[in-house]
Amino acid sequence: MNILEKIIEETKNTIQKSKAKKSLHNLEELSEQYTKREFIKSIQNKISLNQSAIIAEIKKASPSKGIIRDEFNPIEIATDYEKNGASCLSVLTDKPFFKGDIDYLDLIRKEVEIPLLRKDFIVDEYQIIETKAFGADCLLLIVAALDKFQLKDFFDYATSINLDVLVEVHNLDELETALTISPNLIGINNRNLSTFEVSIQNSIDLKDNIPEKVTLISESGINNASVSYTHLRAHETRE
């Protein structure tokens, strides 16, 4: 069993516990309290100004690195990101492997104005309405974690309740599957979720297979200005 499979198995256990605490009806009522912030448009606005559109990540830990930040204050991190020009925030909500918490979404939303992405392993429709109920504007669908029928059903449900969707791929086969649902936003993850190895070349290799009308996000491995510049130049040369 690889890392992704272990995470999915544990995620399913977490979902059962969540369902016991809050019903779908409860979540639907909670979801009505938020006005959507436009996640995709926030990114596109920066791109239209020829600026880097950064989705800044709020993450305490990961399976590959362990604890990343001992003194972890998600609100302080979020407000710092916003002050320094982030377009959007990506909030890890997986608890067993990333030490996240879904409550971070609501806490952070109250302190910032920019849109929020719930970054988690979505494998059940319950998580989709849960995402909206806790204040996220966008959710992540990982093609490697879903079959093609789940991908379409989850995408359709999320968009029907006015959530933006970031569809994540890791290779050409997954990209071809993603394109069958006509997403507006595709993320190429430079991290292999089976091994957790990172190569930014992954984005450069796959980018030309994505239609120009689709907003492209490069994920993972961008940790300094030089790498960011390389990705910006690669993006500009898309056919």
Predicted regions and their residues:
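Conserved N-terminal beta1-alpha1 strand-loop-helix module at the mouth
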Residues: M1-L105, K110-I114, Y157, L163-S182, ...
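Hydrophobic faces of well-ordered beta-strands that scaffold small-molecule active sites
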Residues: I54-A56, L89, L116-K119, L139-L141, ...
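Alpha-helical segments flanking ligand/cofactor-binding loops in enzyme cores
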Residues: T79, D106, I129, K152, ...
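Active-site-proximal loop/helix of nucleotide/amide-processing enzymes and allied scaffolds
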Residues: G100, L117-K119, E125-Q127
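Conserved anion-binding
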Residues: V123-T195
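Catalytic core of soluble alpha/beta enzymes
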Residues: H170-L216, G221-Y229
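Conserved small/polar residues in nucleotide/adenosyl-binding loops
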Residues: T230-E239
